[in-house]
Amino acid sequence: MNTIVKHTVGFIASIVLTLLAVFVTLYTNMTFHAKTTIIFGFAFIQAAVQLLMFMHLTEGKDGQVQSFKVIFAIIITLVTVIGTYWVMQGGHSHHL
């Protein structure tokens, strides 16, 4: 896929994901938790679109290495955030 087509597809996908998030927020009767979960899902999908379409993550001779670096960074971030939340929730329950 050439660059112009790739950028156009990425741009349209980003706009669609943004509009879907706005629609879910303004025009549905879901609970706050459901809306938040759906919007975070759209955000992660949009981040992947940005990395693949605009940042050319998988292109070039180091594309696979770059992909593994991003996956590793995501795993480390998730472990840190989830672990911190887990420890903070556990510690808070013992003080009450």
From Swiss-Prot:
MF annotations from Gene Ontology: cytochrome bo3 ubiquinol oxidase activity; oxidoreductase activity, acting on diphenols and related substances as donors, oxygen as acceptor; proton transmembrane transporter activity
Keyword Cell membrane carried by entry: yes
Keywords: Cell membrane, Membrane, Oxidoreductase, Transmembrane, Transmembrane helix
Primary localization: membrane
GO BP annotations listed: aerobic electron transport chain; ATP synthesis coupled electron transport; electron transport coupled proton transport
GO cellular component term, pick one: cytochrome o ubiquinol oxidase complex
Pfam families: COX4_pro
Subcellular location: Cell membrane
Catalytic activity: 2 a quinol + O2 = 2 a quinone + 2 H2O
Domain of life: Bacteria
Membrane topology: Multi-pass membrane protein
Transmembrane parts of this sequence: 8-28, 37-57, 68-88
Enzyme Commission code(s) on record: 1.10.3.-
Keyword Transmembrane: yes
Family: Belongs to the cytochrome c oxidase bacterial subunit 4 family.
PANTHER family: CYTOCHROME BO(3) UBIQUINOL OXIDASE SUBUNIT 4
Function: Catalyzes quinol oxidation with the concomitant reduction of oxygen to water.
Protein's recorded name: Probable quinol oxidase subunit 4
Name of the gene encoding the protein in the UniProt record: qoxD
